[in-house]
């Protein structure tokens, strides 16, 4: 018996003991300390558009983008640009524009001809950037015919002529674009054609020559969605997402990228990259959760400008999973110096169309390094990019992708959300708190929720982010329009006004501003004020919980008395309010005090208890299974040792006893096909009046052709043909119990025992005794021919063709079957006395040596009588009829004896036939290929 069950509990115990040391790599979503909405907010906090604008009343504002200049908030929308004085808004006048410009499309008719809807044929202001300190550049879609204008920042009056907006502004308002002025030139990234098939990074409107990216080259840009552009050092950086080229085998997988170009790039030579960028490089932004299997947030949604983080300039970005993946969002920060260092990495290439992208070895990279700015660093010897060698220009055109990806700060996301709506926008205040050293993130989602998050290592110094507040900022009554509910609730813009202590939230149909904190809700309860952990709130001894703005809150306490926070109800000397529904701290989530926490069961102890209980149960289960298996094994051994029939007499064995029989009946005269007897039958007695079915010509080992075997030897004994290896090992003292016949095999049929048969029968225990009885002397019957002489019966006939490798008989070629039947009615004749059975029951070697296992659950065979199939039953009470009982030895108890009425055959025995010229022989060991 295998002893595996004894080791299973030990293995399970070791596995369970290792579980407490395993930690989940994926961070959990933080729970909000406070959930609020905008109920009770003043209507002046909302802006939907001009009151006399019928289109705005129907469609809403159709917000496009924010721009803050000198305490002035500019809002680009459909057909308008609104200007809000933040100083006046701070004084409480509400969100009312002090001036605005109107710029309507003059090409509505052509837009309709192009197959566009009326709602799309407006002028959506997609570009709004400062040209200089006095001038503003604005570009609109102009009914799918983009144009640009310049306006005065203070007056919002047009200055100069209109300019073409192609490659500066998209044709469709749903297409992405970014733009920025750097050293007097406009750097823009958008789609340059009506079908949005030509994505371009373009420079224009400056003293330097216009340049663009390679056209229709997927290695440079492949269906990009531009998010942000900024100037840093000698380069201009573009942040976008695009369909990956290095993982194209995975399908349309989007990756987040950052690309850069040199501000002093003058283009290539006439031989390579003429009027194209010679410094365009890009690499991947890696925002992922580390682990054995890295989980990526690949889709860049929004990005901030440079923010101070730990004394270094960093960019905060919102990333999401793929559109067909599990919804999830993450916030990752990247240091600008790490991004610059990433552009010094190795180049990547694809050797073959189906091959993987691999780094290029350094010995294949030309000098100076491709992508370097001419006149700086390694390319300082070249005054202009037009003077660069051709091999450098050719290399940079074919290898714009770099490796590896830029890692995030702390090499993991600052925040992950998997059970909430997807994040869409981000705004960061890196100078929060009384000492301007706390970083607070404001995140917008696609369900209209604003999340206020304290970054890890903030005020509490913990490693996990703290979700301070969750605000539902959407109002269907003020922001709904013809847009769908999902599109209308999506936050598409966030603008932070730290001086005014406000956050502007933009939806498609409206904009609203929120205060950065609402400390007054905590009232005079010190515990509630400090438990909120809001860096914009602090406890003042005389004024209670107040707002902290900049460095003016140095006299405000944000730590408080820890003892007063841990014990007792929320009481204050000024109000005397207590904890409860009326307390301002009621509903604020906070940590349990240590006294309550100590009453809980430690997690290691709980896990150890569970592991011990499971191990004990596994041990008991293994012991029970082992005992059951041993008991079953002993019972099986007893069954094998029980004396009795080695196996019951099968149909094949009985058929082999009667090799001869009458000829098959002639075909019917009416031409009908002879019915094929059933191949399978049952041992159950048939109902009354129903003729017994016939069995098909059962295949026998003699009728199965035997494959030729190497190293054949002649059979030494003609009786060895049908004996197996077991018969050969028992020596000559064993009697042959099998009979090989070259003729067709008989068919047998089982019938129920006849009623009224007397007890005159011969009990047969083994097939050897049955053959001994059949071959013994038999009284002659009336009218029967005398038996053939013994000498004629003992001589072996000529070898049958079937035994010498000839074709096996088919079912329709079989001889007429002999049926073992019972006498239908009448009285049974007297049978001679049963011969004494003194020898032990030998094993039966019938059927080519194949032994069937004896089963104690097998039903006993029915009474069998041998009757010709073609004529009436031979059963009668006259002489020559004998009853045979297939009995069991004395050691096999508990079952009734079985009777078989068998008529002794009048045919001669057919011993195995082996021709002298036959090339077939029994293989070594007496095995047969049946």
Swiss-Prot record:
Family: Belongs to the semaphorin family.
Biological process, per Gene Ontology: axon guidance; negative regulation of axon extension; neural crest cell migration; positive regulation of cell migration; semaphorin-plexin signaling pathway
Keywords in alphabetical order: Cell membrane, Developmental protein, Differentiation, Disulfide bond, Glycoprotein, Membrane, Neurogenesis, Signal, Transmembrane, Transmembrane helix
Transmembrane segments: 605-625
Record-linked PROSITE patterns: SEMA (PS51004)
Topological type in the membrane: Single-pass type I membrane protein
Record Pfam families: Sema
Glycosylated residues, chain numbering: 70, 286, 437
Extracellular side: 25-604
GO cellular component terms, A-Z: cell surface; cytoplasm; plasma membrane
Major site of localization recorded for this protein: membrane
Protein purpose: Shows growth cone collapsing activity on dorsal root ganglion (DRG) neurons in vitro. May be a stop signal for the DRG neurons in their target areas, and possibly also for other neurons. May also be involved in the maintenance and remodeling of neuronal connections.
Sequence ranges on the Cytoplasmic membrane side: 626-930
Bias type Low complexity, positions: 829-844
Coiled coil: none
Keyword Transmembrane: yes
Protein name per Swiss-Prot or TrEMBL: Semaphorin-6C
């Amino acid at each position: 018996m295998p002893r595996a069950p004894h080791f299973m509990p030990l293995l399970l115990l070791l596995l369970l003991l290792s579980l407490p040391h395993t930690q989940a790599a994926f961070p959990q979503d933080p729970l909000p300390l406070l959930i609020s909405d905008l109920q009770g907010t003043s209507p002046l906090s909302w802006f939907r558009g001009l009151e006399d604008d019928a289109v705005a009343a129907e469609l809403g504002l159709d917000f496009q983008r924010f721009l803050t200049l000198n305490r002035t908030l500019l809002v680009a929308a459909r057909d308008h640009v609104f200007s809000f004085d933040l100083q006046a808004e701070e004084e409480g006048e509400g969100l009312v524009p002090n001036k605005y410009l109107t710029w309507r499309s003059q090409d509505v008719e052509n837009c309709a001809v192009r197959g566009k809807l009326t709602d799309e044929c407006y002028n959506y202001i997609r570009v709004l950037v400062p040209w200089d300190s006095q001038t503003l550049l604005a570009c609109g879609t102009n009914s799918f015919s983009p144009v640009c204008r310049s306006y005065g920042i203070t007056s919002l009056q047009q200055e100069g002529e209109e300019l073409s907006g192609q490659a500066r502004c998209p044709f469709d308002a749903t297409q992405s674009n970014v733009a920025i002025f750097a050293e007097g030139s406009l750097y823009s990234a958008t789609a340059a054609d009506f079908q949005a098939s030509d994505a371009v990074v373009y420079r224009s409107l400056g003293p330097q020559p216009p340049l663009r990216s390679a056209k229709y080259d997927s290695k440079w840009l492949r269906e990009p969605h531009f998010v942000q552009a900024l100037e840093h050092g000698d380069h201009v950086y573009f942040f976008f997402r695009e369909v990956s080229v290095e993982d194209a085998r995975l399908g349309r997988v989007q990756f987040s990228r950052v690309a850069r170009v040199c501000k002093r790039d003058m283009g290539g030579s006439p031989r390579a990259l003429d009027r194209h960028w010679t410094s365009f490089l890009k690499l991947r932004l890696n925002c992922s959760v580390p682990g054995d299997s890295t989980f990526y947030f690949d889709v860049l949604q929004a990005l901030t400008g440079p923010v101070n983080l730990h004394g270094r300039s960093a960019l905060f970005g919102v990333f999401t999973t793929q559109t067909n993946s599990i919804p999830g969002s993450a916030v990752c920060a990247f240091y600008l110096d790490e991004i610059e260092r990433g552009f010094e990495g190795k180049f990547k290439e694809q050797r073959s169309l189906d091959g993987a992208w691999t780094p290029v070895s350094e010995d294949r990279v030309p000098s100076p390094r491709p992508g370097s700015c001419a006149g700086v660093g390694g390319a300082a010897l070249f005054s202009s990019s037009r003077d660069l060698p051709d091999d450098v220009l050719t290399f940079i055109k074919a290898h714009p992708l770099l490796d590896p990806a830029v890692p995030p700060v702390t090499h993991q996301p600052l925040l992950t959300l998997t059970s909430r709506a997807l994040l869409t926008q981000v705004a960061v205040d890196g100078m929060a708190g009384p000492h301007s050293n706390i970083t607070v993130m404001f995140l917008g989602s696609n369900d209209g929720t604003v999340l206020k998050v304290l970054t890890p290592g903030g005020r509490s110094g913990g490693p996990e982010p703290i979700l301070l507040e969750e605000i539902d900022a959407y109002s269907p009554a003020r922001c709904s329009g013809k847009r769908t509910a999902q599109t209308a609730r999506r936050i598409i813009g966030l603008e932070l006004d730290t001086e005014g202590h406000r956050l502007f939230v933009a939806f498609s149909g409206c904009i609203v501003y929120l205060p950065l904190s609402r400390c007054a809700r905590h009232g005079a309860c010190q515990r509630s004020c400090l438990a909120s952990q809001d860096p914009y709130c602090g406890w003042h001894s005389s004024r209670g919980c107040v707002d902290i703005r900049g460095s003016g809150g140095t006299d405000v306490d944000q730590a408080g008395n820890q003892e007063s926070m841990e014990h007792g109800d929320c009481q204050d000397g000024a109000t005397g309010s207590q904890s409860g529904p009326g307390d301002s701290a009621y509903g604020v989530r906070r940590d349990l005090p240590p006294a309550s926490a100590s009453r809980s069961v430690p997690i290691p102890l709980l896990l150890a208890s569970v592991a011990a209980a499971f191990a004990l149960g596994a041990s008991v289960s293994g012991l029970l299974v082992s005992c059951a298996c041993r008991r079953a094994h002993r019972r099986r051994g007893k069954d094998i040792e029980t004396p009795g029939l080695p196996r019951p007499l099968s149909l094949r064995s009985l058929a082999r006893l009667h090799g001869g029989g009458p000829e098959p009946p002639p075909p019917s005269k009416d031409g009908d096909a002879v019915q094929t007897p059933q191949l399978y039958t049952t041992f159950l007695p048939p109902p009354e009046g129903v003729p017994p079915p016939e069995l098909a010509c059962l295949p026998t080992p003699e009728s199965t052709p035997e494959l030729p075997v190497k190293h054949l030897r002649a059979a030494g004994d003609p009786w060895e043909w049908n004996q197996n290896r077991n018969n050969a090992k028992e020596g000559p003292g064993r009697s042959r119990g099998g009979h090989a016949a070259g003729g067709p095999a008989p068919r047998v049929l089982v019938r129920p025992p006849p009623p009224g048969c007397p007890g005159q029968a011969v009990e047969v225990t083994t097939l050897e005794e049955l053959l001994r009885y059949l071959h013994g002397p038999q009284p002659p019957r009336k009218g029967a021919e005398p038996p053939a002489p013994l000498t004629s019966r003992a001589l072996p006939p000529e070898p049958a063709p079937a035994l010498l490798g000839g074709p096996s008989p088919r079912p329709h070629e079989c001889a007429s079957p002999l049926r073992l039947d019972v006498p239908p009615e009448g009285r049974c004749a007297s049978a001679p006395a049963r011969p004494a059975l003194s020898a032990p029951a030998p094993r039966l070697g019938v059927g080519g040596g194949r032994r069937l296992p004896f089963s104690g659950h097998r039903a006993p065979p029915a009474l069998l009588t041998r009757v010709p199939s073609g004529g009436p039953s031979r059963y009668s009470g006259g002489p020559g009829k004998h009853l045979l009982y297939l009995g069991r030895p004395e050691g096999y108890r508990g079952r009734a004896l079985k009777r078989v009425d068998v008529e002794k055959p009048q045919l001669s025995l057919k011993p195995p036939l082996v021709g002298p010229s036959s090339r077939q022989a029994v293989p070594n060991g007496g095995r047969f290929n049946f």
